[in-house]
Curated annotation (Swiss-Prot):
UniProt cross-references to PANTHER family, sorted A to Z: CYSTATIN-M
Range of residues in the leader sequence: 1-28
Cystine connections: 98-113, 126-146
PROSITE patterns in UniProt: CYSTATIN
Location(s) in or outside the cell: Secreted
Source taxon at top rank: Eukaryota
Entry annotated with the keyword Secreted: yes
Name of the protein in question: Cystatin-M
Function text: High affinity inhibitor for cathepsin L, cathepsin L2 (cathepsin V), and legumain. Involved in the regulation of epidermal cornification, and hair follicle morphogenesis and maintenance.
Gene this protein is translated from: CST6
GO MF annotations in UniProt: cysteine-type endopeptidase inhibitor activity
Residues annotated as glycosylated: 137
Lineage of producing organism: Eukaryota, Metazoa, Chordata, Craniata, Vertebrata
Length: 149
């Protein structure tokens, strides 16, 4: 009878030994981020603001609108550590009175562009995925999905 429990006891002892052999850091800090884990961020975080600017600039370059859009509200922001940092942003955007021209290209300070009013006004709610690689000083819009509000 005692021998039939021996493999179970040895297995449990092995599991306990493995858990005790883990480095103290692996056991003591479960609140730290792991690679690939999504992390909620404040919309006011300066890095979130930079990622949002990059997303809006890329959106404006690819958009067929004759007017620029700018973000009006960052609803939700998350990041994921990959080969760089992926930002997942949910934002509201509004059309502005600033027209796209070949002269200005994409070098317009959108904060100086007033939001459009009346019939010209267009509001969007967008989900953006932006990859920022700080050591290469680059950002890339990977995905976006916008719907009219």
């Amino acid at each position: 009878m005692a021998r039939s429990n021996l493999p179970l006891a040895l297995g449990l002892a092995l599991v306990a030994f493995c858990l005790l052999a883990l480095p103290r850091d692996a056991r003591a800090r479960p609140q730290e981020r792991m690679v690939g884990e999504l992390r909620d961020l404040s919309p006011d975080d300066p890095q979130v603001q930079k990622a949002a600017q990059a997303a809006v600039a890329s959106y404006n370059m690819g958009s067929n609108s004759i007017y620029y859009f700018r973000d009006t509200h960052i609803i939700k922001a998350q990041s994921q550590l990959v080969a760089g940092i992926k930002y997942f942003l949910t934002m509201e955007m509004g059309s502005t009175d600033c027209r796209k021209t070949r002269v200005t290209g994409d070098h317009v300070d959108l904060t100086t562009c007033p939001l459009a009013a009346g019939a010209q006004q267009e509001k969007l709610r967008c989900d953006f995925e932006v990859l920022v690689v700080p050591w290469q000083n680059s950002s890339q819009l990977l995905k976006h999905n916008c719907v009219q509000m």
